[in-house]
């Protein structure tokens, strides 16, 4: 069961789907427009690139492709009227911790699902040690944090081996007392709220604690200001056409400046940099009359990586979105029908069961909650991914390009030196 909420406070609008909109509409007060900056001399000079080995670059590229495939599954599974927001980075970190709880065929199938055949858990751990350190240092003007935790039933202590592996992810370990389900749920949710600066306040309900054996949780938080800030005086009330064709009036931000842009057959991709340029906000905008589903189907991750500057007239709605998806385990099985998470095997590998018996057939689920707010100042975003194990104990560069987001589109946040996606979203309603 998936839950989605669109927060109307900022009249948000970011999605992916096919709608029509008014063509060639440009409402620009040239007098108020800021001067177009030349990005060549001052763009990204303070960003700190993340240095990956050749093997880590290969892992990174493979994970990017895997992430886009998961997003496509998520989009295909959405209900009409839904907006989608996914954090590939949060999911992949959680799966990295999860992989350390596996061996044999179970591990091999997970790595295959993640597009990482030929790599080991050790390779994945080394990659994430580099990424988790590097991404926090990429831009000192951007607030970014990633935190991990491991929660386990008081009857089952993790083995020294597994506890040592989790140190690769700086995971904090906590004991769950199922006799105090309300307190345990409160502790987990307080941890989530603290690590996301209050943007996501819960990931688990009290009723889920009773049969919870363990939980692996990743939480990330991001806040960055635009390199080219939108002037609040340029924001106007303007029409947005939803995926169903309904016209809605929305607060729409406007700016004309030099941005990275690439036009493709049926859609365009633009990047809006944050602060020192280590991170970009990217948008995939279908041409008027082009169905967004067809764009998503043919979209490859390489299409998001653009390198040429153009003068672009951006019109983007302000928005605030929350999303919850409980079907991530299903999406993984769609990517690899052979994947079978043997909960008993994973449990036996990583816990000292001396003196205790438990019901077999652990049930696993993967839940992700996300949040994003976009306004004239910048972007604030958060994500939490929880892996839960339940059981019973016992173009011409001089041309101005119109890029008007007045119909459904894709969007996200990307780290530039490694092209790692932190968030990918669809806005259409």
PLM features: what roles do these ranges have?
Residues 88-102, 214, 411-416, 421:
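Extended, hydrophobic/aromatic-rich amphipathic alpha-helical segments that build helical scaffolds
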Residues 95, 106-110, 290-293, 323-325, ...:
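Extracytoplasmic/secreted cell-surface and envelope-processing proteins
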Residues 81, 121-283, 287, 307-395:
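Non-catalytic, conformational "gating/processing" segments within enzyme and secreted inhibitor domains
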Residues 1-17:
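Sec-dependent bacterial lipoprotein signal peptides
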Residues 216, 268-284, 396-429:
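Extended hydrophobic
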Residues 7, 19-178:
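Detector for small/aliphatic-rich hydrophobic stretches
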Residues 286-308:
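Internal alpha/beta scaffold segment
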Residues 30-44, 359-360, 368, 377-381, ...:
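Non-catalytic interaction/Regulatory regions outside core domains
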């Amino acid at each position: 069961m998936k839950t989605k909420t669109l927060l109307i406070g900022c009249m948000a609008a970011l999605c992916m789907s096919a709608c029509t909109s008014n063509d060639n509409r440009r409402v620009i007060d040239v007098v108020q427009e800021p001067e177009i900056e030349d990005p060549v001399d001052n763009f990204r000079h303070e960003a700190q690139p993340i240095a990956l080995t050749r093997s880590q670059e290969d892992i990174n590229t493979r994970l990017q492709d895997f992430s886009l495939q998961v997003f496509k599954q998520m989009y295909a599974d959405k209900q009409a009227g839904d907006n989608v927001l996914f954090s590939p980075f949060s999911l992949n970190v959680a799966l990295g911790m999860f992989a350390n709880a596996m061996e044999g065929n179970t591990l091999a199938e997970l790595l295959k699902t993640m597009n990482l055949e030929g790599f080991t858990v050790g390779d994945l751990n080394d990659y994430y040690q580099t990424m988790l350190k590097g991404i926090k240092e990429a831009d000192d003007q951007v607030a970014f944090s990633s935190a991990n935790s491991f929660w386990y039933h008081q009857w089952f202590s993790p083995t020294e081996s597994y506890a040592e592996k989790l140190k690769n992810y700086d995971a904090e370990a906590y004991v769950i007392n199922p006799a105090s389900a309300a307190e345990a749920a409160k502790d987990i949710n307080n941890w989530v709220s603290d690590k996301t600066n209050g943007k996501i306040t819960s990931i688990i309900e009290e009723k889920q604690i009773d049969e919870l054996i363990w939980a692996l949780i990743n939480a990330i938080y991001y806040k960055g200001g635009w390199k080219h800030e939108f002037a609040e005086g340029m924001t106007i009330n303007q029409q947005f056409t939803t995926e169903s064709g309904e016209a809605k009036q929305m607060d729409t931000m406007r700016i004309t400046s030099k941005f990275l842009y690439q036009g493709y057959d049926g859609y365009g991709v633009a990047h809006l940099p944050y602060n020192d340029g280590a991170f970009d906000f990217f948008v995939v905008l279908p041409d008027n009359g082009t169905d967004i589903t067809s764009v998503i189907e043919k979209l490859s991750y390489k299409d998001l990586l653009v390198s040429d500057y153009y003068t672009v007239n951006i019109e983007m709605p302000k928005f605030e979105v929350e999303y919850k998806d409980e079907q991530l385990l299903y999406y993984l099985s769609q990517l690899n029908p052979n994947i079978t998470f043997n909960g008993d095997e994973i449990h036996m590998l990583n816990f000292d069961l001396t003196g205790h018996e438990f019901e077999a057939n652990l049930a696993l689920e993967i839940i992700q909650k996300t949040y994003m707010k976009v306004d004239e100042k910048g972007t604030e975003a958060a994500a939490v991914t929880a892996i839960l194990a339940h059981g019973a104990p016992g173009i011409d560069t001089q041309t101005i390009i119109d890029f008007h987001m007045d119909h459904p589109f894709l969007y996200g946040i990307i780290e530039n030196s490694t092209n790692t996606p932190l968030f990918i979203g669809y806005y259409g309603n």
